[in-house]
Amino acid sequence: MKRLAVSILCLALAGCAIEKAEVRTPSFDEQLPAPQPSYASGSIWQAASAGIAEDHKARRKGDIITVVIVENASASKQATTDTDRKASISASIPYLMGLEKQKLILGKLTGADLGNLLGASTDSTFGGSGATTRKENLVATMSAKIIDVLPNGNFLIEGRRNVKVNNEDQIIILQGTVRPRDVSPDNTVNSSLIADARITYTGEGVISDRQRPGWLMNFLDYIWPF
């Protein structure tokens, strides 16, 4: 009887217990390193010498290409415009029912000349000239990384070089498309062989700030009507 009472009491306490919620921990996919290729060692060809015959030219995403930047550009333009326009008009009525020699002034008819009934003339002249000359020269060497390989095999490259001298940053940014056959055996390519090339050369620092007008001058130039 005593055992039965203890069993009933335990069941009652178990029914009043709060069920503990199961805590689920997020599962993460384990990232395993890519397996390295294995080479079978032979009597002549050893696994350690497998890189001797390998082509070291950049051809995969992430490979690095050395770009030799040589950009020379010059342009000049001159324009001269001269225009001259003249126009004249005149009209007369030699005969008008005999009234060509009469004119009504203050109730009296006097002689009238209809030979110069209407006359007008205009003269417009315009002259303008302009000339512009621009020269650019950029020589540099930098490395760029293959960021993508297109379906036709061409490389999309992108590179950035930052040189800081006396708190002045000189920044070169390069983007473009390169054909694999244009990459030389020493893994270099000339900038003239890069399609859709975007080469930006800029600076940040005290000297660059002094080469630009202040914000107030820019504002006055914007609102000044003359």
From Swiss-Prot:
InterPro entries: Flag_Lring (IPR000527). Coiled coil: none annotated. It is found in: Cell outer membrane; Bacterial flagellum basal body. Its main location: membrane. PROSITE patterns: PROKAR_LIPOPROTEIN. One of its GO terms (molecular function) is cytoskeletal motor activity. GO terms for cellular component: bacterial-type flagellum basal body, distal rod, L ring; cell outer membrane. A lipid is attached at C16 (N-palmitoyl cysteine). GO terms for biological process: bacterial-type flagellum-dependent cell motility. Residues 1-15 form the signal peptide. It comes from the Bacteria. A lipid is attached at C16 (S-diacylglycerol cysteine). Keywords: Bacterial flagellum, Cell outer membrane, Lipoprotein, Membrane, Palmitate, Signal. It is a lipid-anchor. Belongs to the FlgH family. Assembles around the rod to form the L-ring and probably protects the motor/basal body from shearing forces during rotation. PANTHER family: FLAGELLAR L-RING PROTEIN (PTHR34933:SF1). The basal body constitutes a major portion of the flagellar organelle and consists of four rings (L,P,S, and M) mounted on a central rod. This is Flagellar L-ring protein. It comes from Geobacter metallireducens (strain ATCC 53774 / DSM 7210 / GS-15).
